[in-house]
A protein has these predicted regions:
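Short amphipathic, charge-patterned alpha-helical segments
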Residues: 279-281, 422-439
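Short helix/loop capping segments that flank catalytic or ligand/cofactor-binding pockets
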Residues: 121-122, 129, 173-175, 203-204, ...
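Hydrophobic alpha-helical positions that pack around
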Residues: 304-422, 434-437
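Structural motif
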Residues: 109-112, 140-141, 156, 248-251, ...
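Accessory "access/gating" subregions that flank catalytic or transport cores
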Residues: 206-245, 393, 407-408, 419, ...
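Gly-rich Lys/Arg/Thr-decorated short loops/hinges at beta-loop-alpha junctions or inter-strand turns
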Residues: 20, 194-201, 253-265, 360-365, ...
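Ferredoxin-type iron-sulfur electron-transfer modules in oxidoreductases and energy-metabolism complexes
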Residues: 21-111, 115-148, 152-181, 201-222, ...
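Histidine-anchored nucleotide/phosphate-binding helix
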Residues: 93, 272-286
Length: 567
């Protein structure tokens, strides 16, 4: 480098000197003044905090239908963040269309066809192919997408932000012609109607000291309520762990109902949102939370609208201070259903699961103690406080106490959310769903989402509840029940599940990232290499960071065990 100044003349436009300082051109992508003005107009008076990055990316995506490189650069400038930070977050989430300078923006209209197991059984693949054949690709973009939480109306798709249930080519064309791409808002119980039935009286009694936190906690423990997001941890015990930590403390609500086959949270929120909201405020009071955050999946636009309207009504009513409850909008990442990944996303980052310990009750949101609850759990907390523990512990079947909200879909006559005793068997659930479709014979079932795998019809007497399925290599999870018939292949269902895991792996750990990809390739073959698949499954279970990779092999193992003739 002794003659660096002379040699560097050959590389004009890179360096001014041989010391790596002073560029002829600005470092990185140049700032576009028009893009900056557009971003500033969209953000308005909103705070420029890093934890709001995903919210601000949504503003750009909603306004322009994509996020250009110049808008990313402008957003980074406006938020005083590096371009790399903004880019890595924007490209992590499936609902952000990041476009480089050399790429053309996508068509103005996007159709996302659900490819979950329930929709696949209902002909989603054929529907997608027909739409691709019939519609102009320059005007409409057609994508496959994971479960949208509408398995009871399969096949379903999303046109803009509007869902079309029982979708056909004709109904989609009609919707496109109408130009209506916004979600219809269902009839629901608003604040005034909820108050008229005694709503928020339980919260008032707790706030005024008529009922102590210990009393409420003991009532929950007596009821037997356990977390209904899938893990099943006793709900009341969580409060003690969080209260034991020094404040400020937060509540984070996991509304990212992304487990395929699950739609119970949406069912309750689109009908009785204030049962959930009262339960949230009771839990927040119990841990003396400084603020509450609700992380809601982007696939539920009607729910997002309802929560926005009703939280504003609660603020106007004096129930809560302004901005005490913040709703954060997901962006299409199943991994954010894992509690620590959800917290990362609320903080405006990629949804990568954290290593534990520490646990989120000790060091969660913004490194503070955080109480994490599921939507349905909070729904039941409010009901128990209003009606007493007997609404759960007073119901018993097959030696199990309580009630379960089963999301039922597949080859049944009347799919939907079925509130049944927790000791119900798959036969009870099929009966509640109107029985099998005509011409279909019960063959197999998914008891609790793809992570629970597939069980054969011969195992039809097991109560579908916490702790009853582990002996069979499965678990109840979110109680997402999909029923298969003799018209279906178990191996195809398992492949659908593993393709989902392959798509949704966050990529942080090799066993999950590579394991899911390799498993799909092996399962696509006519004959499965069962020894290699078992070795792969063992590595994924033992070495994956979070529950996604640890549970992903369940469909493989259960098909090998119960349906060997198919593989």
């Amino acid at each position: 480098l002794a003659t660096a100044p002379d040699k560097l003349k050959i590389k004009q436009g890179v360096w001014k000197s041989g010391h790596g300082k002073g560029r002829h051109r600005p470092k990185g992508r140049a700032l576009n003044d028009q893009a900056l003005s557009q971003v500033q107009a969209l953000l308005g008076t909103r705070a420029r905090r890093a934890d709001l990055l995903i919210e601000h990316l949504h503003l750009i995506q909603d306004a322009y239908g994509h996020i250009s490189a110049s808008h990313l650069r402008a957003l980074a400038e406006e938020m005083r963040m590096s371009q790399a930070e903004v880019y890595e977050v924007a490209t992590f989430y499936a609902h952000f269309d990041v476009i480089s300078e050399d790429d053309s923006p996508p068509p103005a209209l996007t159709i996302r066809v659900c490819d979950s197991l329930s929709c696949e059984l209902a002909g989603a693949q054929q529907l997608k192919a027909a739409l691709e054949s019939d519609l102009d690709a320059t005007q409409v973009r057609i994508l496959r997408a994971p479960c949208m939480g509408r398995c009871d109306t399969a096949p379903t798709l999303e046109l803009g932000h509007r869902h079309i249930d029982f979708a056909t080519v004709e109904s989609v064309k009609e919707a496109i012609s109408s130009g209506n791409t916004h979600a219809p808002i269902p009839d629901y119980q608003d604040l005034a109607a909820y108050r008229a039935t005694g709503g928020y009286d339980a919260l008032k009694a707790i706030r005024e000291g008529q009922r102590s936190v210990d009393d409420i906690q003991n009532t929950l423990l007596e009821s037997g309520l356990r977390g209904l997001g899938g893990a099943g941890f006793p709900s009341g015990k969580k409060w003690s762990f969080v209260r034991a930590e020094e404040g400020p403390r937060y509540v984070a609500v996991n509304g990212d109902e992304g487990e395929p086959g699950t739609f119970k949270d949406r069912f309750y929120l689109e009908r009785e949102p204030h049962l959930f909201l009262e339960g949230l405020l009771i839990a927040a009071h119990a841990v003396d939370a400084a603020r509450a955050y609700v992380y809601m999946r982007d696939e539920y636009p009607a729910v997002l609208h309802i929560l926005d309207e009703e939280i504003k009504a609660m603020e106007a009513d004096g129930l809560i201070e302004t901005d005490y409850i913040e709703v954060r909008r997901g962006a299409g990442a199943y991994i954010c259903g894992e509690e620590s990944a959800m917290i990362e996303s609320i903080e405006g980052k990629r949804g990568l699961p954290r290593h534990r310990p520490p646990y989120v009750a000790q060091k969660g949101l913004f490194d503070r103690p955080t109480l994490v609850h599921n939507i349905e759990t909070l729904h039941w907390i409010a009901r128990i406080c209003r009606e007493g523990p007997q609404i759960l512990n007073g119901v018993e079947k097959n030696g199990r106490k309580g009630l379960r909200s089963y999301s039922v879909s597949g080859r049944v006559n009347n799919p939907g959310v079925k509130l049944l005793p927790a000791g119900s068997t798959i036969i009870d659930i099929i009966d509640a769903a109107g029985g099998m479709l005509e011409g279909h014979t019960f063959k197999a079932y998914q008891p609790g989402g793809p992570s629970s795998g597939l069980l054969p019809a011969s195992l039809d007497s097991i109560p579908l509840d916490f702790d009853t399925l582990q002996a069979h290599g499965s678990f109840i999870g979110s109680a997402a029940v999909v029923v298969l018939s003799d018209k279906d292949k178990a191996r195809d269902a398992a492949l659908n599940m593993l393709r989902f895991f392959e798509d949704e792996s966050c990529g942080q750990c090799t066993p999950c990232r590579v394991g899911c990809e390799k498993a799909v390739k092996l399962m696509e073959k006519d004959q499965w290499d069962t020894q290699l698949l078992e070795e792969l499954s063992a590595v994924m279970v033992d070495a994956s960071i979070c529950g996604l990779g640890q549970a992903a092999p369940n469909p493989i193992r259960l098909v090998m065990k119960h349906f060997p003739e198919e593989i």
